[in-house]
Amino acid sequence: MTEARELAVVVGATGAFGQAIVDRLAAAGLGVVAVARSADSLAALRERVPGLIACAADIASDASVETIAAALDRPVRMIVHGPGVGVAGGILTAPTATLVDAVNIKVGGLLRLVRAADGRLATGSRIVAIGGHYGFEPTAYAAAAGVANAALMNAVRQLSLAYGPRGVTAHLIAPGPADTERLRRVAADRAALRGIAVDEVLADMLADSSIGRFTTPGQVAWAVAILLAPEADAMTGSSLMLDSGRRRGLP
């Protein structure tokens, strides 16, 4: 790693998606600033990824803007906003405060990240948000993810309009249910609501996919990396659907 390399900033860097994204962007030759709440988790990630810049910050707090900005010492090629939100249950039972928290993390967090990096963005820089399938295809059992990811898409569209004149593009990546520990928590919550076994819920989730699969963190990282191509300018304001054939609606 050299100091001349452009940076990628990854929020949620120690999660399943985040670690795969960090690996992919580091392999692409970018210096990576990894943002997460846990300093211990960041230290473990730094041991695995040589040259990683660890930045302990809570993206749900406005204080993160100054903390992240202080970690940036050169041009930023890409920012990736991928924090997780809590499993709040279905729309009939989810605490309203949990929904507000989810929007604060997803939308408020994205805006904090953008503001932290703004002075380092240049023509060709990418703003990337990791949303989710439930923002487009709602379910009664994932209220926080559905509401927050729908709002996130709107925010990405607004950012694409605001940053377009500067040659900076904004993108949403929307994975379907992914093979992660968080999915197991979602399945357990849904199983409790329906009074069935967790394995039955997971089987139902697989059946929703036209290819009978969950999305993987590696596939999400691949989608992030392809946005580095100059041709991806044409995709600003759009969503990359990585739902393994789950979406039924048009367009």
Regions inferred by a protein language model and the residue ranges of each:
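Conserved glycine-rich cofactor-binding loop
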Residues: 14-15
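Rossmann-fold cofactor-recognition segment
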Residues: 48-63
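Amphipathic alpha-helical dimer-interface segment in Rossmann-like NAD(P)H-dependent oxidoreductases
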Residues: 70-74, 105-125, 160-161, 229
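Conserved NAD(P)H cofactor-binding loop of Rossmann-fold oxidoreductase domains
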Residues: 82-88, 245
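Catalytic Tyr-X3-Lys loop
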Residues: 85, 92-112, 128, 145, ...
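Catalytic loop of short-chain dehydrogenase/reductase
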Residues: 126-165, 176-178
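Short, small/polar-rich loop/turn modules that mediate ligand/substrate recognition or access, typified
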Residues: 164, 169, 235-237
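Short C-terminal tail/terminal secondary-structure segment
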Residues: 232, 236-251
